[in-house]
Amino acid sequence: DFTNDLKIKSISSSSHSSKWSPTFGEEKNILNEYNKMKVLLSKDSLEMLLLFKIFNDGVAFKYDVPNQKHIISYDIIDEKSEFNLSSDDKAWWIPAFSYRRYEFLHAFSSVDSISKKYFSENVEDITYDSLGIDAAHTPFTLKKKNGFYVSIHEANLVNYSSMTLAPKGDGATPLGPKGDEVTPLGPKGDEVSPLGPKGDG
C-alpha cells in the first residue's frame, strides 16, 4: 500500500533537449525539451519512483516500481491519484464505460456535472448503453475561469489499463481505474497485473 507513510529517500533532477521527426504532421521536427525530477519513495523495505517531466506547455508524471529484490511481480488493485480542479471549471468530455462504442459528441459542463444522466439529457441518450460509474474518457479539456485551457490525457500505457476521470464533488476528479469499473487485466481479477519492474523511463 503506497497511499500513506511514504518517506523520501532521494531526489534527483536533470534536463533534456532533443528533436524528433514525426511521420505525419505540419512540423518537420518537434522539439523535445523538458526538466525531469525523480523522487525515490520508500515504505518499509519497498521502493517506488515518482517521475515528473516539466515542459514549456505541460507537465507529465508517472509512477514506477524499480527493480528490487523484494518484488518479482505485483498486482495493482486501485489507483488513488487525483486532479484537484475548481468547481468553476468547465470541461468538454465524453462518457466512459459505454459498451457499444467509444466516440461521442462532446458535452460541455462543469466538472461536477459529469454523469450519464447529464449526457443523456443534454447530448445523446446513453441510458441503454452504459455500465459502471459516472466518468469521462480522456482527452479531457478544461476551460478555466481565468480563460486558460488545460487538457488531461494519458500516454505510455505499458502493462497498465487506460484512464478515466470520475467526479467526486467540489472539483476533485480522481484518475481511474476504480475497482470493478474496469475490465480486469490480471488473471486473478485485479485491475492491472504488471509482469515486473520495467525501468524508470
Enumerate the language-model features and the residues they cover:
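N-terminal accessory beta-strand-rich subdomains and adjacent acidic, glycine-rich linkers
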Residues: 1-201
